[in-house]
Amino acid sequence: MTGKRELRVKPIVNGTVIDHITSGQSLNVLKILGINAASRYVVSVLMNVPSGEMKGKDVVKIENRELDPEELDSIALIAPRATINIIRNYEVVGKHRVDPPREVSGLVRCGNPNCISNTNEPVTSRFTVERTGDDIQLRCSYCEYVIDQEIADHLL
């Protein structure tokens, strides 16, 4: 298939395409965005797609929805190489890479069972985001607990 492109999913008219998601993380991206079976958006998910620059990647297409910057940057917690494409009338009108936020609140559960954010107190979890290259770690603002692996397992 030299020189040919394979079309796996039809193009979208308007919406957002999240490309170069770390392989196996597309469902966690949907979780971060609050998209589930009850959502009204048409969503296409491609998993383990061959890619020249990555061993494999996932792709998410969300029709008729443009994501806000906070949502996009939260994706960087689990997919630091993701690229966001804004589509209007079948054309890419905006494209950028995600950039992790400096802090996340209410998105991740602290791994320390004794943390105040895991008790019956009305406290929202809050983490400082620390990045070294593609490696992301989260430090709890209350107890200093560090999550440096399997961040997706700690998503609320």
Curated annotation (Swiss-Prot):
According to the record, cofactor stoichiometry and binding are noted as: Binds 1 zinc ion per subunit.
Q: What does the UniProt keyword field contain?
A: Metal-binding, Pyrimidine biosynthesis, Zinc
The family line of this record is: Belongs to the PyrI family.
Note the Gene3D superfamilies from the entry: Aspartate carbamoyltransferase regulatory subunit, C-terminal domain (2.30.30.20), Aspartate carbamoyltransferase regulatory subunit, N-terminal domain (3.30.70.140)
Keyword Metal-binding found:
yes
Function, as annotated, reads: Involved in allosteric regulation of aspartate carbamoyltransferase.
Which molecular function terms from Gene Ontology are attached?
A: metal ion binding
Q: How does it assemble?
A: Contains catalytic and regulatory chains.
Name one cellular component (GO) term: aspartate carbamoyltransferase complex
By its UniProt entry, which PANTHER family does this protein fall under? Answer: ASPARTATE CARBAMOYLTRANSFERASE REGULATORY CHAIN
Which InterPro entries would you find in this protein's record?
Asp_carbamoyltransf_reg_N, Asp_carbamoylTrfase_reg, Asp_carbamoyltrfase_reg_C, Asp_carbatrfase_reg_C_sf, Asp_carbatrfase_reg_N_sf
Known cofactor(s):
Zn(2+)
Write the protein's name.
Aspartate carbamoyltransferase regulatory chain
Carries keyword Iron-sulfur? no
Against HAMAP family, the record matches this protein to: Asp_carb_tr_reg (MF_00002)
Q: Where does Zn(2+) bind?
A: 110, 115, 140, 143
A single GO BP annotation from the record?
pyrimidine nucleotide biosynthetic process
Q: What is the species listed in this Swiss-Prot or TrEMBL entry? A: Methanocella arvoryzae (strain DSM 22066 / NBRC 105507 / MRE50)
